[in-house]
């Protein structure tokens, strides 16, 4: 009798522990947003992925699913981002289309990206990000004139100037117009803007035009490398820039 009673207590305790763990794993909305705000401030994408996955285990939510897909995108995991987007990919939503297009561009699927961007423009004809992304598609396809037109349209629709100007500069670089790239980037640098991608493109363009002295001055001032001469040598040996791809993450996040 005692053994049976003891066994029953053990089972009850075991069940209680399991139930307690399950209860603790449920995230209330207040706690969810609190944790999310901390993780966002820390740029802790891995933590955000865990948080969003746990929330979706409790209940399906399109907004949380989109956040999960975006967190995967920000870690560079295009495959997972597209996978978790799939259940909501059919919905006419600007944010969904934008994230789809970014992922497809990163996969070098410019045809697929263009198709998604066209859907985006159909529901949002004046979407600045749509024109920025189609500009990237054009640039990656070697259609430099079309890419510049798209970037200018994006800028006219008030995408951040830093994004527009950098992409216009890269389009010029793809076309071996390094003096144009410097003309676009240098004013922002002199105005105190220090975006890492912009700095890299400015230094690269200066080196391509033979102004290694000014390039070295910027590298030292901005602490871009421990050995400025080594970086200059490496950048001076880069060729076939037109074979490179214009990224999406640095321009939009």
What is each model feature region?
Residues 20-83, 250-253:
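N-terminal leader/linker segments that initiate helical-solenoid repeat arrays
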Residues 54-55, 85-88, 119-120, 153-155, ...:
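Canonical positions in the second alpha-helix
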Residues 42-50, 75-84, 107-116, 141-153, ...:
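Structural signature of tandem alpha-helical TPR/SEL1-like repeats
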Residues 192-253:
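Terminal, low-structured helical/coil segments at or just beyond the last alpha-helical repeat
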Residues 28-29, 62-63, 93-96, 128-129, ...:
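Helix-start (N-cap) detector for alpha-helical repeat units in TPR-like alpha-solenoids
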Residues 57-58, 90-91, 123, 156-158, ...:
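Structural marker of alpha-solenoid helical repeat scaffolds
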């Amino acid at each position: 009798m005692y053994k049976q009673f003891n066994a029953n207590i053990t089972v009850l305790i075991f069940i209680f522990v399991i139930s307690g763990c399950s209860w603790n794993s449920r995230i209330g909305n207040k706690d969810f947003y609190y944790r999310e705000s901390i993780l966002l401030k820390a740029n802790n994408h891995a933590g955000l992925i865990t948080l969003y996955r746990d929330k979706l285990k409790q209940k399906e939510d399109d907004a949380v699913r989109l956040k999960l897909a975006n967190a995967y995108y920000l870690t560079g995991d295009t495959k997972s981002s597209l996978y978790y987007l799939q259940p909501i990919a059919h919905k006419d939503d600007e944010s969904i289309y934008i994230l789809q297009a970014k992922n497809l561009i990163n996969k070098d699927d410019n045809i697929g990206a263009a198709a998604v961007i066209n859907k985006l423009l159909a529901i949002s004809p004046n979407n600045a990000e749509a024109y920025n992304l189609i500009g990237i598609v054009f640039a990656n396809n070697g259609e430099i004139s079309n890419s510049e037109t798209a970037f200018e349209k994006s800028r006219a629709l008030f995408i951040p100037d830093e994004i527009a100007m950098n992409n216009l500069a890269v389009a010029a670089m793809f076309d071996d117009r390094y003096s144009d790239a410097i003309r676009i980037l240098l004013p922002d640098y002199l105005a105190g803007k220090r975006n890492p991608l912009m700095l890299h493109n400015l230094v690269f363009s200066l080196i391509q035009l033979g102004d290694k002295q000014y390039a070295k001055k910027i590298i030292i001032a901005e602490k871009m490398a421990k050995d400025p001469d080594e970086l200059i040598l490496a950048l001076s040996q880069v060729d076939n820039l037109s074979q490179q791809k214009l990224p999406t993450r640095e321009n939009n996040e």
